[in-house]
A protein has these predicted regions:
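Bacterial N-terminal signal peptides
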Residues: 6-15
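N-terminal active-site segment of His-dependent metallophosphoesterases
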Residues: 20-91, 95
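Extended active-site neighborhood of metal-dependent phosphoesterases/phosphodiesterases
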Residues: 23, 90-201, 298-302
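Active-site-proximal beta-strand elements of phosphoester/diester hydrolases
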Residues: 32-45, 157-167, 209, 275-282
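Metal-dependent catalytic neighborhoods of phosphoester/phosphodiester hydrolases
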Residues: 48-49, 77-95, 112-130, 220, ...
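His/acidic metal-ligating clusters that form di-metal
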Residues: 69-71, 159-162, 174-267
Length: 337
């Protein structure tokens, strides 16, 4: 009965997620897979000064794609936040497409606050050959499950979940940022359960990417017993309601890391109940508030391992907060290089 319920929830949440993955992701010959997370770029052409700052952001994108050579690019929200927005979206995605790198976009709370609605942004994003996004039944970006094949085998070795954490509360009398809907929680649970069954009863290691932090981030960062790295120069602004997404992730045993943005002055990783709760690094420039050096979070997976390596690449080329997450613990490799 539980399996039937989970399957029904998954089907109801988004038919689009049942479609075949549009582009193959595969581990390299050396057994690694590299991900670049760009977050809160806040590209804005609305004024000359903001456009000039956005040019710096485009230059950063180009440098990282050239130097780090990621196998996947994930944009975790608040990508284009000024009008006219379409030209900025196309310029951004054209750049990734020129490098031949697949990408996935999740939206933030500010992406639809200019001259494009969420469905209009979704049509632009999904028009690219390299896009791993799909349209949901409502015309917006669907939550998607992506899999990475092994070097030789076509069987999935890892999975990624790119999820919509929405924008603001939709309940009268409750103010604050958005949260995952119950259907999304059950969809993720169903996906992870199905992958475990297909993997001979062993949970398939996976990462989740979204914009707004889970409520569990707050207590996890403040727990002195949790291993961690990075900094928080502001308080977290998680979704105002807790609908059980973290509990679902922990219960399935599949998700080993979550990566968000939203809070520009936070870039920490903290281990909580076997899951690495992580932030990217603010990847934009002076079109919005920021007090950290702009940068990009890199993630490196190894086929056959449940852990991962990560660092932040800053503008001057420095690698900072180089760490490894394995067996539920964050271990610092180096602070700066």
């Amino acid at each position: 009965m539980r399996k039937l319920f989970a399957a029904a929830c998954a089907a109801l949440w988004s038919v689009a997620t049942l479609q075949a993955q549009p582009a193959e992701l595969r581990f390299r010959d050396d057994g690694t897979f590299r991900i670049a997370q760009f977050t809160d770029m806040h590209l804005d052409p609305s004024k000359p000064r903001r456009l000039a700052e956005s040019e710096k952001t485009f230059a950063r994108l180009e440098r990282v794609l050239t130097s780090e050579r990621p196998d996947l690019v994930v944009f975790t929200g608040d990508v284009v936040t000024g009008a006219p927005a379409e030209g900025m979206w196309r310029r951004l995605l054209d750049a990734v497409e020129r490098h031949g790198i697949p990408f996935c976009v999740v939206l933030g709370n500010h992406d639809a606050e200019q001259d494009l609605a969420r469905a209009e942004i979704a049509r632009i994003v999904t028009s690219y050959d390299g896009s791993l996004n799909r349209l949901a039944d409502n015309g917006e970006l669907a939550d998607v499950e992506l899999t990475v094949a092994g070097r030789v085998s076509d069987r999935p070795a890892w999975a990624f979940y790119c999820l919509d954490s929405h924008d603001y509360s939709t309940i009268e009398g409750i103010d604050g940022y958005g949260w995952f809907f119950p259907g999304q929680v059950e969809w993720l649970r169903a996906c992870c359960t199905a992958r475990t069954e297909a993997n001979g009863g062993r949970p398939l290691p996976s990462l989740a990417f979204f914009h707004i932090a889970l409520p569990e981030y707050v207590a996890a960062w403040r727990n002195p017993d949790n291993s961690h790295i990075g900094r928080a120069a502001e308080d977290e602004c998680p979704g105002v309601l807790n609908t059980g997404m973290f509990a679902a992730m922990a219960a399935t045993g599949s998700v080993v890391g979550t990566f968000v943005g939203h809070d520009h002055d936070i870039d920490y990783l903290v281990a909580e109940k076997g899951i690495c709760l992580g932030y990217g690094r603010f990847s934009g420039d002076n079109t919005t508030y920021n007090n950290l050096r702009p940068g990009v979070r890199m993630l490196v997976l190894t086929e056959g391992a449940r852990g991962f390596e990560t660092w932040i690449r800053e503008d001057d080329g420095r690698m900072v907060d180089h760490a490894r997450f394995d067996e539920g613990k964050i271990t610092e490799i180096s602070v700066e290089r």
